[in-house]
From Swiss-Prot:
Compartment(s): Plastid, Chloroplast
MF terms (GO), sorted A to Z: rRNA binding; structural constituent of ribosome
One Pfam family from the record: Ribosomal_L34
InterPro entries, alphabetized: Ribosomal_bL34
Source organism: Spinacia oleracea
GO aspect biological process, one term: translation
Transmembrane helix listed as a keyword: no
GO annotation, cellular component aspect: chloroplast; mitochondrial large ribosomal subunit
Transit peptide: 1-91
Subunit structure: Component of the chloroplast large ribosomal subunit (LSU). Mature 70S chloroplast ribosomes of higher plants consist of a small (30S) and a large (50S) subunit. The 30S small subunit contains 1 molecule of ribosomal RNA (16S rRNA) and 24 different proteins. The 50S large subunit contains 3 rRNA molecules (23S, 5S and 4.5S rRNA) and 33 different proteins.
Name of the protein this chain belongs to: Large ribosomal subunit protein bL34c
Main localization category: plastid
Entry superkingdom: Eukaryota
Amino acid sequence: MATLSLLSTGVGAAITNRTPSASLTFITGSRTTNKRVSFNGGSARSGSLHCSFLAPSSSLSSNFSGLSLGLDLTSNTGVSTDRCRRFVVRAGKAALCLTKRSRSRKSLARTHGFRLRMSTTSGRALLKRRRAKGRKILCTKTNPSSGKRASP
């Protein structure tokens, strides 16, 4: 069974020469592994250390599948502080530059129409469910260019 026994972060011994470091000790069954990582002036890109450890399948227990550590070393001496930029999705108002918000029936029919529903297995299953429910209109977004609903 793999366990994390020691996790420490520290700085160098000299006050003038401060180097961020991390020390990890892993105990896997009968073996103990010590790992020590330190950052020098330009060797690292960010101020955070990301370690991940996955135990081998021979010592893998059912209740331990892996360990992922993210250490944020606050000392920024000689280390650039690039932040991870994440894409944030927000539900908000429509942009001011968009004047036409509605789409034409033809473009809606291309993505939600009867012919598209019939071309896929899940679409045919959807049509089958709507028929069983008794819906008169199977696909509401179909472009009525021909048939009963066509305008003269």
